[in-house]
Each structure stands twice: as C-alpha cells, then as structure tokens.
C-alpha cells in the first residue's frame, strides 16, 4: 500500500520533470474537443508549500494560447500543488482575465459557454474513522464509500447525456460532459442538474457553473500524491487507489 501524503517540492519536481507526459493530456483533449483556451496553476494554497512563497494563496493564470509544450515548462517552473484547465469558452480568451476576476461569466458578452462537469468528492463524506478530519486530511474509507456511488451517478448522467467521461481526481471523481448542448446550459439548468444528483456527494459549485477550473488530466494532486487519471466505469469499479500503478507516482515507489 502506497501512502497518501502531501507532495514535497522535490516530489513535484520529480513528477513533472521525469514522469509527467504532456502528450497524454494533449491526446485526451484531442479526443474530447474543444481544447482548453486557458490553464491555471495553484502554487500551494492548501499545503502552504510553494517554490515561490509569495505565490501561496494565488491562482496563476497562464497566457491564452499557450502550447502544451509551454504548459509543461510552466509546470516544471512553478511545481504547483494543483494544475487546472478553464472550462469556459471565450470569444476572445486574451481578454478573459477581467471577467474571471468578477466571476460573472454567464452575463458577459465575451462568454460563449462552459463545459458541464461534476465533482464527486470524498471531502463531502464523514465516517467513524474521520469525524474530526480537516479539509487537507484524506480518509480512504470515505473514498471507498464514495466509489460505490459512481455507477449510479454515471447511470443518471447517461440518461441525459451521451458523452460522459470519468476522471479520478485524487480524492474523488470528476464527471465531464462533452455533449454540445451541455455547453449552452444556463445557470438555472445547471442547478436543475444538481438537484437530480443530490445524494451523490457532489460539490454543487462546480456543476452550478460558478467555478471555472477543473483538474488537468494526468497532472499531480499534491494533497494526496496521486495522478489525475481518466478511467472507464469498469476501471473505476476495480480501482484500488492505495496500490493501482496507474495512479501512483514514481516518487512513492522508491
């Protein structure tokens, strides 16, 4: 069993310089267009571990139009706690920063739509083993209870949408919806989706549309030292995150 631990800067450097395969991420977006217009990094808000301490509690928004090759260079430079892509679609992404700061995306003329996504998070559970846990703590028992609900949640989403993808996020699962109609959903329609998925431990802010960022596939979740990994439903059902080689970074194996 490999531990769930906060990744040190040395761990992050080992991952992004040696193991991280940016081509896998690029291929994933090619299969699930459109490709992101913007990416963002969190240097160390939760762990308080950052290469540049002045960047703690800041979201580092990268320039629009950045290539995947340049994105990897930024990951190696900043060694972030988390790496994200922006689910919003913009007419002019280079002008998006002002509206991002206001968080009033849906009423802005520069806004074209947002990828619908659901964040099923073990942080939303409590059990006898972790009654007093803090946000940064991880409970494997809660995660395994969460995993049991994935097939039901996936089934509900497939009743309404055709293109539903699952990504193991490190502490839970993300459901990505790539149907064209989903991008055009209003805030009210997204809230209705939340209502249908009550009881599945979702973070409503993500699917409601107010949070634009979601984890970059194949990046490192530095809160638990696990690789953000796309999976099929069958792969989810047999997933053992304490031992599955696909989600374990090499620095834990040494």
Regions found by a protein language model. Give the residues of each.
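Short, surface-exposed linear patches
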Residues: 106-107, 138-142, 197-199, 236-240
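Long, low-complexity, charged/polar intrinsically disordered accessory regions
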Residues: 1-12, 24-25, 195, 201-254
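Signature for HUH/AEP ssDNA processing cores
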Residues: 1-170, 179-188, 192, 214, ...
């Amino acid at each position: 069993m490999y531990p769930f631990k906060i990744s040190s800067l040395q761990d992050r450097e080992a991952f992004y310089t040696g193991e991280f395969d940016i081509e896998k991420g690029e291929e994933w977006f090619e299969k699930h267009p459109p490709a992101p217009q913007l990416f963002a990094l969190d240097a160390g808000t939760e762990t308080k571990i950052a290469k540049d301490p002045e960047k703690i509690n800041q979201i580092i928004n990268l320039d629009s139009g950045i290539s995947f090759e340049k994105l990897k260079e930024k990951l190696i430079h900043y060694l972030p706690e988390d790496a994200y892509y922006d689910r919003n679609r913009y007419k002019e992404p280079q002008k998006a920063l002002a509206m991002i700061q206001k968080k009033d995306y849906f009423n802005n003329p520069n806004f074209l739509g947002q990828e619908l996504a659901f964040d099923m998070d073990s942080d939303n559970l409590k059990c006898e083993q972790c009654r007093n846990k803090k946000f940064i703590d991880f409970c494997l028992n809660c995660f395994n209870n969460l995993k049991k609900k994935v097939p039901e949640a996936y089934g509900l989403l497939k009743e309404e949408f055709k293109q539903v993808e699952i990504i193991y996020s490190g502490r839970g699962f993300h459901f990505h919806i790539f149907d064209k109609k989903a991008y055009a959903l209003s805030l009210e329609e997204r809230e209705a989706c939340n209502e249908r998925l009550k009881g599945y431990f979702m973070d409503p802010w993500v699917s409601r549309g107010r949070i634009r960022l979601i984890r970059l596939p194949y990046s490192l979740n530095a809160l638990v030292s696990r690789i953000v990994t796309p999976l099929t439903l069958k792969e989810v059902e047999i997933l053992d995150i304490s031992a599955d080689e696909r989600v374990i970074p090499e620095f834990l194996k040494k």
